[in-house]
Amino acid sequence: MLGWSRLTFILLSGIVTCLVAQQVPPWTEDCRKSTYPPSGPTYRGPVPWYTINLDLPPYKRWHELMVVKAPALKVIVNSMKNIVNAFVPSGKIIHLVDQKLPGLLGNFPGPFEEEMKGIAAVTEIPLGEIILFNIFYEFFTICTSIITEDKEGHLLHGRNLDFGVFLGWNINNDTWVITEELKPLTVNLDFQRNNKTLFKATTFAGYVGMLTGFKPGLFSVTLNERFSIDGGFMGVMEWILGKKDAQWVGFIIRSVLENSTSYEETKNILTKTKILAPAYFILGGNQSGEGCVITRDRKQSLDIYELDPKHGRWYVVQTNYDRWKNPFFLDDRRTPAKMCLNQTTQENISFATIYDVLSTKPILNKLTVYTVLIDVTKGQFETYLRDCPDPCIGW
């Protein structure tokens, strides 16, 4: 066990490092240019595509994918168990997860419970641990999302998904354990019905909700976590205690991608539906002005911030802080993102220049798993695994 003097030194060193980390080079940098098509040290590689056949029974939909990804899923589930056991070494928490969690969190809506049971069966991972893997994303998703509109009224949507803060640090290669273990699980999915694409999404194999996706020709949506005292833990506790009138945020994204038929319908659902965890829904459409950030607490919408190109608002940027508040000074990705977009100018916005913005530190950081670029109108959806070689901020 660390002595108090050593522990204090480590904590103080970390605080001092963080105080300066996001304010000076090499932790920040000038806006990147010419990073697209992706290459070089910040590009880990492409993300594979798989098809999910929604005509199959829910229990069987994920079998083909999970046969391939079961080994990688077992690695990350074991890491999650190790993190839990580090706090409660007796192993009692994991025993409760395996034995009690399915009963406590039973009656998931729609097809999700059967899908998770099917994943548990094919991977031979206990159902409780599959459920734990699925609810993790109610709490730890830290992201940057952008929607832009060019001079012709054409919309683009980009996002970095950052995940894994405080979930294990590998001192041998200076990376977050969970972040690195999610990269082999990252997949692009083509959800089909009657052999036709219904929607496309990027997710982690084993997770049946969605955080990033689009319905070709109609709308795109990404989810960012919103920090709040009345947060996801409270929502989960209410669910366990029997109050199940709210939706899991990853499941509501999956639901609108599967069932909604327009930008306005999706906007209405994401604005009014009760949810288990506070969130930001970043929604893009297919016409001028159809782009917004919906700031949510668990019961209602607090703000809808929309594109307004006629008055010069040709982009919206959302990280993990309310737009009317200053971001936490140790985690300001909003300011550099807006600065780089302003330097780019509306005339030059494209997949390439959005990728440049999302490749600029600290928008790109040690937590970044992947970058997605979406063009709803053209039906383009590109996902790239990322790296942030040292020197690089931890978040």
From Swiss-Prot:
Localisation per UniProt entry: Lysosome; Secreted
GO CC entries: extracellular space; lysosome; membrane; nucleus
Pfam short name (any one): NAAA-beta
Active site (UniProt): 143
Glycan-modified residues: 195, 259, 286, 342
Signal sequence extent: 1-20
Entry keyword set: Disulfide bond, Glycoprotein, Hydrolase, Lipid metabolism, Lysosome, Secreted, Signal, Sphingolipid metabolism, Zymogen
Cystine crosslinks: 31-340, 388-392
Example GO molecular function: N-acylsphingosine amidohydrolase activity
Protein's name according to its UniProt entry: Acid ceramidase
Organism ancestry: Eukaryota, Metazoa, Chordata, Craniata, Vertebrata
Gene symbol of the encoding locus: ASAH1
